Regions:
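Intrinsic-disorder/low-complexity, polar/charged segments enriched in Ser/Thr/Lys/Arg/Asp/Glu/Gln
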Residues: 62-67, 113, 127-129, 141-143, ...
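Short amphipathic alpha-helical face segments that pack within enzyme cores
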Residues: 87-95
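Catalytic strand-loop segment that frames the active site of acyl-thioester-processing enzymes
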Residues: 33-83
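A short beta-loop-beta micro-motif enriched in histidine and acidic residues
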Residues: 82-87, 105
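Hydrophobic beta-strand-centered segment that forms part of the acyl-chain substrate-binding groove
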Residues: 95-135
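HotDog/MaoC-like acyl-thioester-processing domains
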Residues: 6-32, 122-124, 135-188
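A structural signal for short, well-ordered beta-strand segments
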Residues: 68-70, 114-118, 132, 146, ...
Length: 188
């Protein structure tokens, strides 16, 4: 057999890339994410992005969290067969953002510090999960913790991050053109 999957399988895999983004993940409705979202991590139509999708749920310990799935691709490696550290960080950061947005009730931006650790990098071609929850919450600040787990539930990595409310005035002063769906969620 030659390199890569047989031609018929390659055609099938190519057709999957053209499907509409999933609306359900593990039987739970996905969190709303506009198709025009340009984000590399979670933009549902980003041509080269990770296209991460999340749902909100209650964990076994009763804590609310966001959860998603991802399968590293063969062109997303650092070391052979291992997901690139920067992309692993991105998955964890995206989950943290969605936890802040969904569980914090408004739009937040990261402020630092951010602490990233990798016990083991996710393996290419295997399904992994990412989850994030708030570990501290106040009106003007949040702390989130995200974790990735591999098959069998083994911890792959963790990211702790700090967040503050997004400000419309700060975005305007910086000249950042934001879509209305984001501006509507921001503090003045």
């Amino acid at each position: 057999m030659g390199p890569g999957p047989p031609r018929s399988l390659r055609g099938f895999l190519g057709s999957l890339k053209r499907l509409e983004p999933r609306r359900v993940l593990l039987g739970m409705p996905l969190l709303e994410n506009p198709p025009e979202n340009p984000c590399f991590g979670c933009g549902p139509n980003h041509p080269r992005g990770l296209r991460l999708a999340f749902r909100s749920e209650v964990a076994d310990d009763g804590t609310r969290e966001v959860r998603g799935e991802f399968t590293p691709k063969s062109d997303e490696v650092g070391w052979p067969t291992l997901f690139h550290h920067g992309l692993h960080f991105t998955v964890l950061y995206e989950a943290s953002y969605w936890a802040a947005l969904t569980l914090g009730g408004k739009l937040w931006v990261s402020t630092g510090p951010i602490t990233y650790s990798a016990d083991r990098l996710p393996r290419v071609g295997l399904l992994h999960t990412v989850s994030a929850r708030l570990i501290e919450s106040a009106d003007t600040s949040l702390r989130a913790r995200a974790e990735t787990h591999g098959p069998g539930g083994k911890l792959c990595g963790r990211l702790d991050s700090a967040w503050r409310p997004a400000s419309r005035a700060v975005a305007e002063r910086a000249g950042i053109p934001l879509p209305e769906y984001l501006v509507a969620e921001m503090d003045p």
